[in-house]
Amino acid sequence: MLSGQSITLRPVHASDMEMLYDFHTDIQNRGEYFPRGILSEPAFQKQFQENGFWGKDDGMLLIINSANETLGHIEFFKTVNYLDEYELSYQVYSTEQRGKGIMTEAVNLMVQYLFETKRMNRIRLIIHPDNAASRRLAEKCGFQHEGTARGAWYNKGRHHDVEVYSILHDDVIPTS
């Protein structure tokens, strides 16, 4: 578990699966910029059975508050095999909890953890240009804007440009 001031990041437990699948399939509550694809329940369960949503180059942690309520999740994954980077994906499940700094704390905890435990030089965020909340989050967490990837993301029936942000290992854990 990774503990912050107001949240804890913890692995997914078997007892979380029903709730987690309900959030996974609630497309209307995902927010405007979260991918719309869903897995079947057997495929979702199989993925959990294989590795508990935690592997060498990918993983998911739940975001838990002090009342032990699940607020959302954060994931990391290897982008492509020839780049020395991970990408983060995240979601706050309840619209009432959005905009309260939960994800800023979660991203900071995850970035610190990944750079302390993985031999990876950079972590990136891919953000829709209209997603002002995620752009602010990236900047608050020290990510640098690198530019626009034109037509790189397909969602809701069309291709979208995305903004690329990154943070480097030495930005977080300077070498002496």
Specify the residue positions occupied by each region the protein language model found.
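Acyl-donor (CoA/ACP) binding surface of acyl/acetyltransferases
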Residues: M1-I27, I64-S176
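Conserved GNAT-fold acetyl-CoA-binding loop/helix
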Residues: Q28-Q49
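Sparse recognition of residues in long alpha-helices and their boundaries
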Residues: R36-G37, M60, Y154
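A short helix-loop-beta-strand connector motif used in the catalytic cores of GNAT acetyltransferases and
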Residues: E50-L62, G72
